[in-house]
Amino acid sequence: FAACSPLAHAQQDPGEWRQRVFVYGMGAAIEGDAQIGNVKVPVDVSISDLFDALKFGAMAAYRVENDVWSFTGDVTYMNLGWSAQTQQGRASSGLDVEQITVMGTAGRRLTPHLEALFSLAYFDLSADLQVRVLQQRTEVSRDASWVDPLVGLNYVVPIGGKWTYTLRGDVGGFGIGSDLTWHMITTFRRQNTQRFAWYLGYRVIAYDYEDGSGRNYQHYDLRQHGPGAGIAFSF
């Protein structure tokens, strides 16, 4: 949640640079479609089985900002999985995804509450697909990596007392890395002290990536989403 959490520093020089370190964890569900070669797995997580699909993700980030510019670097790790079978158990399918995302973001303040963002995001993905029909089982695995540019907006508004609400959205890909990537974060932050804050929020990362042909063909049209909580230290 790093790039979406500027602080108000009315008493400080507008040109003075401030630093923050963030750590947060999130539960993440996954849905969409994944295909490797001719093996395709549709992932559809309903409300009833959402928590069966939840696995763990974590992020660390560093942000430096003044009242005009901000620069953020963050690393996110996600381990996601899903599986389903027919009622009679004659067929089943599953998907496991291990993903590292490294994102660098530059921000320019447009108004006291609104920031324009430009990011470069590197995705490193390991996917494992399993399909079983009766006693015949097929499993395929592939690795993929790509870089996406993104543009976005970040809106931050105090909501009383020590609380702040934030909404950030980014869109990118544009056929450079993926066909389409989009990213959304919404958070509520409580500033306990001048140097310590904690967060509750919800995050979505989605991409449509396609590469290769024949047995080496890969297509991932996936959405990863879930609640998260984190802490931040300012200095």
Predicted ranges, named:
Residues A10-G81, G228, S234:
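Short glycine/proline- and aromatic-enriched beta-strand/turn motifs that initiate or cap beta-hairpins
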Residues G15-W17, L54-A58, E65, D96-V102, ...:
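Residues that define the transmembrane beta-barrel architecture of outer-membrane proteins
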Residues V21, A60-N66, G104-R108, F118-L120, ...:
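Residues on the lipid-exposed face of transmembrane beta-strands in outer-membrane beta-barrel proteins
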Residues V21-G27, G73-Y77, F118-Y122, L167-V171, ...:
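Transmembrane beta-barrel strands of outer-membrane/channel proteins
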Residues G32-D49, G81-V97, L125-D143, E210-Y220:
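Flexible, solvent-exposed loop segments that connect beta-strands
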Residues A34, H183-F235:
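Predominantly the C-terminal beta-signal and adjacent terminal strand-loop region
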Residues V68-F71, H113-A116, G161-Y165, Q194-W198:
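Repeated loop/turn-to-beta-strand initiation elements of outer-membrane beta-barrel proteins
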Residues T164-D179:
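Transmembrane beta-strand segments that form the barrel wall of outer-membrane beta-barrel proteins
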